[in-house]
């Protein structure tokens, strides 16, 4: 067998070499012996190595060296593999290879395997037979004849002669050949498991030749055998050659190609003389070793290939009789016949080799044989496909072509697979480790190990099966999960669609319902006028001229809206052009080498460090519209003075072109677009002729057409698609031309999901941004405007890549709430809360300049004050919270924002409804869009007098007014979004409000009656030195005093002090149950609050007055209720912490005490579900805002609002007035009227009328015996008030509800109601068991005698007071009730920033008091001294007795000796100098830097102190001993050591000063001990003298000893009351012990 080349591939097959050395597929020289690995050699004698007498030639018989022939074979093989058989060079090389033989041109001899090859190509020739992989259409295919030396065909050449010519004499004799053949046949039969016949056994042993062999022998020529014959005998193989060795196996006898015909009787296949079809004969090379030619045997019958296309490895040969006979193949006529194999006859008898034991089958050889068979079949199939006839059907030819191309791609596919396998090969220990078998001997496998191996294999199979099942299960689970997700997704989409459909249907239903109501209203109006016989009004509605008038009005309105539409379009175009220009400019700046400076508003370069003080500010003349710019315009620093000198001018809003471009660029743009049409700004200035509605120019058809168009367009909704569907480019569609659908919030927003209406609001805000517009988000309070703003910012940051900076301007009270919402919803947004002291704000400047922030939160004041810092930043967006503050166009905030700040995008947030006052509305629109809404006068003039052009003076009727209002709303619609709670009420829990009437205590009734009748407040007479006898005090602002009495009578200082003395309390403060017994509202709270706490309801308690909140705190402390307080004095940084503490889920505080004005704005207190309004506000919107702190988005529980109202009091009238105002506001807003003109003067007149008529009602009801009073019986309602609102309430409404009714109001469900009833029962039982039981409200028998006065007595006291006033002895001090602000807003802000508010207020107060004392000393020097003393002393004590933190009273002076020692010690410490340098150590300790200069010191040091403060305390007698002084000095040194680093100069100086103080004190104390008793007596005298001096300073008169002792005893019992204000003597750095000592008074120290 020959080893064929790899078909269509170049890789030789590995395998053991058949010879002594490696050999290529076609060996280049003769082998010295038979193939040792051949199966044939195992069955017969094998010749030994060649003798020395036969040298190995180095050159082929044709004259070609073997090396040259081998080098020629390589390119031939590569050309053959690459399919280059048609190349002429390939034919030339092939011809040279064919001539290497007995004549020139024959190639090298084949290997021993090639002797047996019956289906594989040689390297030189073409296909040897039909199964050759080389295509038959190659250059060597076709009919070829044996050629002679000259290349001529040898037609008559004898095959045997050719064999003899080509082969040398064989070294085997005849017997050896017979024996070899017998051995081969026996091996084949044994391989098939067949028994050996006897004659074959004899022939194998060489005893007797096989039958038939003798007859065949003489016919064989002795010299050689054909190269293509299936010679099975082992011959001398070719010599060793370079290249890899062929496989170590030999093909069994009879294994030819798959399509080879069976041989005939003579051993030659029929129809094949000597050569198989498809290729020329492959002769053996002729050489000197003539005896090395191998004998051949008769070829056996062929085994046909298996029909499955997958041949079995090495099928066994069958005997000639048993082998199947294949039909002979027809041979082309041009092919020469193959000569019969010749067996050479040798005379010399060789030595018989003994039979070796045959080796077993090698599985590697079987696999290789299988591969070779497959390759042979593939090659044969390729040949068949190439030789298909041309008459084949089209589809068959297509299939054949596909198959042929696929087979030709086999090697490429195999090579690709090998490369992939090499790349994907996994590293294993078996491949990378050393060969273990080379280092140890093989172990004999035992049965146990085989079983273990079998067991492991079984386990491995089970594990593989388990993994396969698991993987399959996971795959199935993933499919099921995907199906589930798929269904869920589509279910959610379907749900969203259904919700949207429902919302659309609801919207259309609501719209249809409203339209129906409107039609009914118009119909009713017509019927009403008809029934009232108002013929003129009825004709107005139905007359044709009315329609013409309406048509004219609509036409004029449409023209105005069209003008606005054009302005909007031009505004958007200008914005787009500006963006392009900015990009172009930016690109140009990037290409430029240097950086150009920024351009200021006047087109000049603007330095970064400039304060814009020398820049001109553009101004505009209000009436003419003339604009001054450049050098004509005033400078920024002289703007205010210039505006005063030039009335009629105002600051022009910054246009967009000024923000980024210069004047030169604007001129270039004007040159590029010289013919751009200027839009008409005002509809009244249109040149278009508008027909007179009274003339006949307007036909009925035209009027009807105009009306129809207006009807289609009058209800223009927020949908752009609807307008486009009607074919109208509507106003809203133009404004919101660019649409972007927003379905979800930004990923930057966490910790919550927006509601659906909030998503719609976000989409509207994004639409404003996309269309370069600004707008107003005017959702009702509590619907989440803050959250929607944060959503807009995060959406722009994520989707639009706009990271800011965003400027948000908010009130100071809501700044902390904004910061809290940002931290909660968008923690990734970098925000800056720009507030605090100037030093704190300056700390933000580096961050602002670097731009490392997204959002800046600040207040209105800092926007104005720090405009030199904040105006330098180019803001992307400006957002103004509580935007209704901008309604005044001339306010400073609006002017500063328009003049100094650059923000192309602006957004206003407001929760209050927009008032329909046209100037205010225009101011907002002008601030947002100055290019669209330019002139206020025209705007107001047109909407107020639309018929001014026609000369008519007729007022608009109702239908025309509604039309204009709708047109006005349409103007606003693209820029305004407002949703009410009722529109989203499905997402909010219910809110129920109850008004709970409260009764008055006897004390309240008495005080209220006298204050209402005479405007006086009863006193105990102590202010006139008539203590206990009673008196009166006339107070201003009677309504405020009545409200105080209704809230709590202890809000009057002297009432509480007198009652505390009457009830036996010390200190002038009433405690305990008498706190709530004195007020009906407090008594009601005492019943309600325990129930709410028991059921875990959190409460918001809103009050109008902070002094009332202080009394409330005392009550909460008495009942043990945990509470929080927030009012106007609460610092902004503390508010956020209070909100967070109250809103925590497990918070122990269930009451939040808030003032309505400070705590009712912008706070989120949704954890509370009960709102108690202790006293109603004049402005009903304030109370609504307070309610919205709890009733807002996020509230889960039902909200109960309890409004407390004292029965038959001024509070009922205030509540009625507030309700009336709220109703009027609703009517105005709904109807759109523009005549809402109420003033504070009218309100005061209205209240005065209330009080006057209430007094008459009170007297009349008292005379008739009725206890209820109502002013509405006789008081006519003020102008415009609906009389129905002021009808007297029913008797049931005046009744105070009982416990069961109150429980029904506050209970959410039946279980709570039952619990409340049981709590009331337990409370009543506990009160009944108390032996000292008192009624829950004070009764008249508990009141002191001085307060129970009849009207005549009160009248007499009032007259006496008036007489005293006339004679200059008025006892009422205006300082008691001071409603004026002692500081201006600017001073107050400055004091807040520097932290010196209390000191400044005290200074102002002292200045006022000093001026007053000066006036008193000038005017009242003739008054008696005794009464003046007592009155002044009482007033002094009363002045200090107010609620709040008690201040330090003026202490009694220290002994002069002690003061002297303290001063001496401190002076010695201060004057101490360093001995080495002469430096005064205390220089830096004398006075600390201020908080403004060194804020970090005050953050670290809790109690700062310096020598200046120590000296001041010595002067004020704060130190009672040297130990107190030592504490402060040591504290001073410790503060220095805490703040400064160890080892620093100040640190070391403080240590030295400590030792100096200690040594000086010891020295002075030793000197003090040496003094005698005489000095002590002198000290006592001096002390008494100093005391008397201090007393004389107080009362201006020196008192006697007895009076002085009594006064001192009285002062020792007196405690400062609740409401006294702090004085600057008590500082924040005082210790708690010192403050407690200050509170305790001066009684014990004065002795």
From Swiss-Prot:
**Coiled-coil boundaries:** none
Residues bound to ATP: 779-786
Domain QLQ residue range list: 171-206
Q: Which residues carry this modification: Phosphothreonine?
A: 11, 353, 609, 1423
Q: In which tissues is it expressed?
A: Colocalizes with ZEB1 in E-cadherin-negative cells from established lines, and stroma of normal colon as well as in de-differentiated epithelial cells at the invasion front of colorectal carcinomas (at protein level).
Q: Name one GO molecular function term.
A: ATP binding
User: Which InterPro entries has this protein been placed in?
Assistant: BRG1_ATP-bd, BRK_domain, BRK_sf, Bromodomain, Bromodomain-like_sf, Bromodomain_CS, Gln-Leu-Gln_QLQ, Helicase_ATP-bd
Report residue spans for region: RNA-binding region which is sufficient for binding to lncRNA Evf2.
462-728
EC numbers on record: 3.6.4.-
**Residue numbers marked as site, Required for binding to 'Lys-15'-acetylated histone 3:** 1539-1540
Question: What is this protein's record name?
Answer: SWI/SNF-related matrix-associated actin-dependent regulator of chromatin subfamily A member 4
Give the source species: Homo sapiens
């Amino acid at each position: 067998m020959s080893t064929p080349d790899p078909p269509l591939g170049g890789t030789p097959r590995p395998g053991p070499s058949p010879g002594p050395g490696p050999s290529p597929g076609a060996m280049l020289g003769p082998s010295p012996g038979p193939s040792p690995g051949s199966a044939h050699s195992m069955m017969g004698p094998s010749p030994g190595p060649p003798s020395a007498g036969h040298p190995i030639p180095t050159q082929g018989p044709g004259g070609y060296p073997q090396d040259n022939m081998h080098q020629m074979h390589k390119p031939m093989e590569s050309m053959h593999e690459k399919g280059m058989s048609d190349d002429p060079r390939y034919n030339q090389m092939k011809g040279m290879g064919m001539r290497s033989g007995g004549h020139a041109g024959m190639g090298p001899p084949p290997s021993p395997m090639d002797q047996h090859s019956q289906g594989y190509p040689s390297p030189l020739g073409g296909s040897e037979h039909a199964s050759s992989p080389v295509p038959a259409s190659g250059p060597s295919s076709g009919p070829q004849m044996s050629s002679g030396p000259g290349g001529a065909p040898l037609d008559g050449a004898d095959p045997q002669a050719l064999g003899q010519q080509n082969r040398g004499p064989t070294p085997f004799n005849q017997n050896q050949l017979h024996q070899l053949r017998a051995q081969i046949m026996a091996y084949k039969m044994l391989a098939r498991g067949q028994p050996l016949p006897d004659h074959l056994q004899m022939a194998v042993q060489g005893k007797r030749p096989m039958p038939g062999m003798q007859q065949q022998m003489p016919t064989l020529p002795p010299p050689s055998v054909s190269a293509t014959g299936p010679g099975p005998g082992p011959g001398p193989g070719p010599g060793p050659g370079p290249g890899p060795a062929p496989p170590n196996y030999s093909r069994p006898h009879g294994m030819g190609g798959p399509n080879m015909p069976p041989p005939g009787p003579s051993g030659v296949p029929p129809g094949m003389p000597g050569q198989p079809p498809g290729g020329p004969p492959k002769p053996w090379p002729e050489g000197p070793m003539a005896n090395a030619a191998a004998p051949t045997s008769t070829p056996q019958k062929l085994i046909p290939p298996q029909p499955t296309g997958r041949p079995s490895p090495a099928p066994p040969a069958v005997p000639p009789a048993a082998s199947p006979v294949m039909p002979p193949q027809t041979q082309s006529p041009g092919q020469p016949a193959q000569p019969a194999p010749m067996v050479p006859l040798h005379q010399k008898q060789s030595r018989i080799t003994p039979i070796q034991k045959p080796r077993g089958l090698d599985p590697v050889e079987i696999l290789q044989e299988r591969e070779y068979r497959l390759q042979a079949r593939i090659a044969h199939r390729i040949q068949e496909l190439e030789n298909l006839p041309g008459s084949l059907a089209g589809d068959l030819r297509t299939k054949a072509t596909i198959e042929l191309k696929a087979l030709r791609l086999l090697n490429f596919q195999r090579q690709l697979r090998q490369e992939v396998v090499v790349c994907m090969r996994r590293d294993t220990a078996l491949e990378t480790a050393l060969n273990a078998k080379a280092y140890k001997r093989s172990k004999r496998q035992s049965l146990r190990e085989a079983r273990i191996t079998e067991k492991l294999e079984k386990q491995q199979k089970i594990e593989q099966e388990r993994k396969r099942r698991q993987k399959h299960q996971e795959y199935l689970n993933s499919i099921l999960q995907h199906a589930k997700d798929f269904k869920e997704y589509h279910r959610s989409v379907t749900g969203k669609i259904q919700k949207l459909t429902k919302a659309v249907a609801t919207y259309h239903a609501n719209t249809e319902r409203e339209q129906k109501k409107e039609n009914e209203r118009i119909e009713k109006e017509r019927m009403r006028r008809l029934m009232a016989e108002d013929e003129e009004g009825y004709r107005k509605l139905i007359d044709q001229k009315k329609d013409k008038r309406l048509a004219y009005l609509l036409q004029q309105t449409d023209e105005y809206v069209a003008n606005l539409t054009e302005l909007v379009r031009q505004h958007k175009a200008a914005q787009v052009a500006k963006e392009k220009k900015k990009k172009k400019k930016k690109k140009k700046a990037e290409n430029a080498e240097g950086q150009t400076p920024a351009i200021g508003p006047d087109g000049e370069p603007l330095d970064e460090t400039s304060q814009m003080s020398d820049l001109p500010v553009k101004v505009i003349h209000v009436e003419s519209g003339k604009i001054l710019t450049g050098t004509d315009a005033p400078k920024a620093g002289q703007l205010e003075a210039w505006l005063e000198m030039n009335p009629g001018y105002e600051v022009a809003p910054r246009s967009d072109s000024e923000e980024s471009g210069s004047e030169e660029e604007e001129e270039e743009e004007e040159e590029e677009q010289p013919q751009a049409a200027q839009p008409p700004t005002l509809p009244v200035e249109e040149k278009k002729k508008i027909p007179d509605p009274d003339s006949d120019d307007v036909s009925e058809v035209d009027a009807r057409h105009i009306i129809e168009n207006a009807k289609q367009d009058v209800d223009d909704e927020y949908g752009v698609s609807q307008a486009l569907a009607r074919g109208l480019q509507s106003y809203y569609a133009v404004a919101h031309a660019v649409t972007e659908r927003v379905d979800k919030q930004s990923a930057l927003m966490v910790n919550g999901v927006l509601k659906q209406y909030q998503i719609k609001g976000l989409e509207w805000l994004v639409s404003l941004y996309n269309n370069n517009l600004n707008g107003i988000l005017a959702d009702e309070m509590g619907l989440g405007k803050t959250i929607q703003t944060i959503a807009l910012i995060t959406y722009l940051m994520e989707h639009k890549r706009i990271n800011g900076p965003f400027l948000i301007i908010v009130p100071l009270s809501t700044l902390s709430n904004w910061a809290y919402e940002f931290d909660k919803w968008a923690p990734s947004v970098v925000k800056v809360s720009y507030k605090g002291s100037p030093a704190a704000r300056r700390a933000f400047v580096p961050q602002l300049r670097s731009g490392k922030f997204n959002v800046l939160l600040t207040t209105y004041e800092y926007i104005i004050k720090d405009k030199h810092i904040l105006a330098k930043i180019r803001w992307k967006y400006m957002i103004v919270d509580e935007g209704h503050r901008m309604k005044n166009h001339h306010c400073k905030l609006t002017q500063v924002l328009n003049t100094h700040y650059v923000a192309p995008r602006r957004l206003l947030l407001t929760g209050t409804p927009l008032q329909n006052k046209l100037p205010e509305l225009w101011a907002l629109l002008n601030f947002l869009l100055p290019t669209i809404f330019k002139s206020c006068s025209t705007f107001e003039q047109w909407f107020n007098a639309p018929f001014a052009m026609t000369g008519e003076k007729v007022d608009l009727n109702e239908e025309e007014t509604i039309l204009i209002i709708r047109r006005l709303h349409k103007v606003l619609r693209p820029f305004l979004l407002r949703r009410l709670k009722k529109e989203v009420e499905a997402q909010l829990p219910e809110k129920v409000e109850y008004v709970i009437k409260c009764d008055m205590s006897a004390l309240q009734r008495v005080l209220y009656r006298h204050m209402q009748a005479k405007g006086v407040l009863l006193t105990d007479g102590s202010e006139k030195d008539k203590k206990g006898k009673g008196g009166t005090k006339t107070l201003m602002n009677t309504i405020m005093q009545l409200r105080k009495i209704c809230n709590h009578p202890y809000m009057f200082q002297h009432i509480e002090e007198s009652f505390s003395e009457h009830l036996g309390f010390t200190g002038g403060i009433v405690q305990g149950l008498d706190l709530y017994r004195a007020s009906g509202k407090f008594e009601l709270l005492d019943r309600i609050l325990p129930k709410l706490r028991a059921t875990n309801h959190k409460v918001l308690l809103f009050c109008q007055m902070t002094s009332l909140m202080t009394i409330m705190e005392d009550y909460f402390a008495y009942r043990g209720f945990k509470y929080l307080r927030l009012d106007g004095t609460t610092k902004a940084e503390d508010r956020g912490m209070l909100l967070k503490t109250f809103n925590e889920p497990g918070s122990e505080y269930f009451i939040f005490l808030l003032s309505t004005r400070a705590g009712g704005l912008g706070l989120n207190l949704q954890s509370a579900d009960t709102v108690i309004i202790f006293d109603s506000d004049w402005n009903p919107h304030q109370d609504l805002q307070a309610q919205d702190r709890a009733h807002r988005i996020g509230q889960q529980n039902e909200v109960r609002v309890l409004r407390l109202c004292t029965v038959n009091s001024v509070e009922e009238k205030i509540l009625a007035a507030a309700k009336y105002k709220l109703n009027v506001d609703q009517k105005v807003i709904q109807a759109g009227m523009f005549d809402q003109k109420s003033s504070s003067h009218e309100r005061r007149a209205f209240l005065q009328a209330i009080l006057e008529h209430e007094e008459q009602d009170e007297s009349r009801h008292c005379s008739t015996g009725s206890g209820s009073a109502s002013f509405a019986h006789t008081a006519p309602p003020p102008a415009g008030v609906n009389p129905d609102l002021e009808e007297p309430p029913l008797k049931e409404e005046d009744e105070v509800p009982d416990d069961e009714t109150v429980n029904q109001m506050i209970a959410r469900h039946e279980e709570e109601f039952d619990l409340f009833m049981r709590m009331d029962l337990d409370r009543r039982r506990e009160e009944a068991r108390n032996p000292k039981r008192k009624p829950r409200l004070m009764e008249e028998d508990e009141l002191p005698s001085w307060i129970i006065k009849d009207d005549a007595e009160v009248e007499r006291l009032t007259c006496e007071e008036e007489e005293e006033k006339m004679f200059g002895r008025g006892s009422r001090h205006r300082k008691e009730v001071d409603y004026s602000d002692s500081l201006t807003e600017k001073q107050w802000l400055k004091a807040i920033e520097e932290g010196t508010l209390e000191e400044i207020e005290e200074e102002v107060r002292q200045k006022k008091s000093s001026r007053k004392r000066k006036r008193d000393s000038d005017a009242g020097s003739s008054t008696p001294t005794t009464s003046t003393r007592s009155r002044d002393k009482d007033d002094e004590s009363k002045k200090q007795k107010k609620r709040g933190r008690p201040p330090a009273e003026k202490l009694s002076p220290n002994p002069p000796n002690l003061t002297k020692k303290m001063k001496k010690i401190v002076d010695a410490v201060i004057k101490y100098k360093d001995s080495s340098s002469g430096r005064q150590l205390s220089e830096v300790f004398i006075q600390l830097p201020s908080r403004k200069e060194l804020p970090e010191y005050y953050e670290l040091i809790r109690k700062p102190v310096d020598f200046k403060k120590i000296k001041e305390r010595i002067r004020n007698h704060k130190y009672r001993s040297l130990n107190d002084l030592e504490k402060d000095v040591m504290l001073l040194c410790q503060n220095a050591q805490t703040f400064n680093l160890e080892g620093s100069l100040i640190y070391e100086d403080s240590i030295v000063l400590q030792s100096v103080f200690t040594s000086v004190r010891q020295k002075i104390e030793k000197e003090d001990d040496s003094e005698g008793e005489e000095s002590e007596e002198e000290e006592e005298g001096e002390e008494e003298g100093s005391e008397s001096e201090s007393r004389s300073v107080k009362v201006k008169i020196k008192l006697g000893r007895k009076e002085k002792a009594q006064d001192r005893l009285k002062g020792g019992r007196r405690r400062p009351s609740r409401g006294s204000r702090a004085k600057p003597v008590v500082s924040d750095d005082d210790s708690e012990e010192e403050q407690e000592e200050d509170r305790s008074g001066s009684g014990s120290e004065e002795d």
